[in-house]
């Protein structure tokens, strides 16, 4: 992101406007896949990141207290990056239905086709501190196993080793 910000500031306003009309404008930004169990705060993490989201004012988008669960995925186009907010269901080891698996595979194919290598620049893994504190060892182990499987699948899909950024949410509620 620092490299992107540096080059963006070197352009004149007219050059920046023309550049935003191109496909490269989105593809050159860093892309992050945001994953985590249901209710871990993935959408809130993005929404409260302090990023300036493009067209937010135009479409009347504003912060809400209860964002609710993400169905399949949401795309967040920010000034300096792109976030793909995924459904918490995608991490379940044996609970992902056929429709969810198809949606995930379609998303990964689209990213790989339109973005080329590396596809995504990193994975933001969001875990709930309250859940980590109160879950049984068996539950934590099950989620850890599911995370490992999904991270290996993503590395295989995007044909690269991806950095994983761990975020612990809801620390203020402990």
What does each model-found stretch correspond to?
Residues 2-91, 118, 170-172:
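Conserved G1/Walker A P-loop phosphate-binding module
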Residues 86-92, 130-135:
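Conserved P-loop NTPase mechanochemical-coupling segment
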Residues 98-174:
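Conserved C-terminal guanine-recognition region of P-loop GTPase G domains, centered on the G4
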């Amino acid at each position: 992101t620092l490299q992107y910000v540096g080059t963006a500031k070197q352009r004149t306003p007219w050059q920046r406007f023309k550049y935003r009309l191109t496909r490269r404008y989105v593809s050159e930004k860093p892309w992050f896949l945001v994953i985590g169990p249901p209710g871990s705060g993935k959408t809130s993490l993005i929404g409260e990141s302090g990023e300036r989201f493009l067209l937010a004012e135009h479409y009347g988008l504003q912060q809400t207290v209860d964002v609710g669960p993400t169905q399949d995925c949401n795309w967040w186009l920010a000034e300096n990056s792109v976030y793909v907010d995924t459904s918490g269901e995608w991490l379940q080891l044996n609970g992902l239905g056929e429709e969810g698996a198809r949606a995930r595979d379609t998303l990964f194919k689209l990213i790989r086709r339109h973005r080329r290598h590396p596809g995504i620049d990193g994975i933001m893994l969001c875990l709930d501190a309250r859940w980590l504190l109160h879950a049984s060892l068996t539950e934590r182990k099950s989620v850890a196993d599911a995370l490992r499987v999904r991270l290996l699948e993503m590395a295989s899909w995007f044909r690269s080793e991806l950095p994983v950024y761990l975020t612990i949410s809801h620390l203020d509620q402990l």
